[in-house]
């Protein structure tokens, strides 16, 4: 699986810069199955929110997607999807998606997408590359859920493969290679899904993040493990950041935990409230 020259099912490129008053888009390009809506500035914020849309309604066998986001120095952007990413059955091929985030010093990208739903016989590969300069910041989330299965299997998709590479000043600081392959692995077992079906992931990188801050984040969310049937852990990355992994049987539980983390870090680091991303 490689990001070589090929006919893309959907392609999107977005660049954001700070014009001295607010962050605005400099270059926006999209074609075929991918589209980005005009930015909105929620609650009179100086940060644009972009909604990314798959006009086809779902990912089909053989689809290939690429998205590139460039955030200039001192620019900030919020990115989200307009709905769940649905991966339908891929009997002959598979689906690939590539996302690249280039964030310059004092730039910030906040990506909170809707769940990725893999239906029966789906094969999905996603490769994310995050290139951050030393004072750049990132908040990124993914939620993986199994779709409807005629046979009522807990994991009816063929595989879901997510690869994340994070670079800070061109040095690789995180290589997260996650493969869920029910045909070859006991994904229900220890070290994988541990009797849960839904998986949430979150990365937060900022120069202010240290072990004490990570412990404070954990204190903010630890009550969720008593309130809901879920399990999670926070890991200090080999840089100024952390990753959060959540296991549950419900998307809403994972979303609640991620939102709590997002609200806490955004308030503590940027002194702002999280805007509700209205989707209809």
From Swiss-Prot:
| Alphabetically ordered keywords of this record | Chaperone, Cytoplasm, Nickel insertion
Keyword hit for Cell membrane: no
Superkingdom as given in the UniProt entry: Bacteria
Q: What is its main location?
A: cytoplasm
State where the protein is found. Answer: Cytoplasm
GO cellular component entries: cytoplasm
Q: Does the keyword Cytoplasm apply?
A: yes
Give one Pfam family, short name only: UreD
From the Swiss-Prot or TrEMBL record, what is one GO molecular function term?
Answer: nickel cation binding
What does it do?
Required for maturation of urease via the functional incorporation of the urease nickel metallocenter.
The record describes its quaternary structure and partners as: UreD, UreF and UreG form a complex that acts as a GTP-hydrolysis-dependent molecular chaperone, activating the urease apoprotein by helping to assemble the nickel containing metallocenter of UreC. The UreE protein probably delivers the nickel.
Family affiliation: Belongs to the UreD family.
Q: What is this protein called?
A: Urease accessory protein UreD
Q: Which organism is it from?
A: Staphylococcus saprophyticus subsp. saprophyticus (strain ATCC 15305 / DSM 20229 / NCIMB 8711 / NCTC 7292 / S-41)
State the taxonomy lineage.
Bacteria, Bacillati, Bacillota, Bacilli, Bacillales
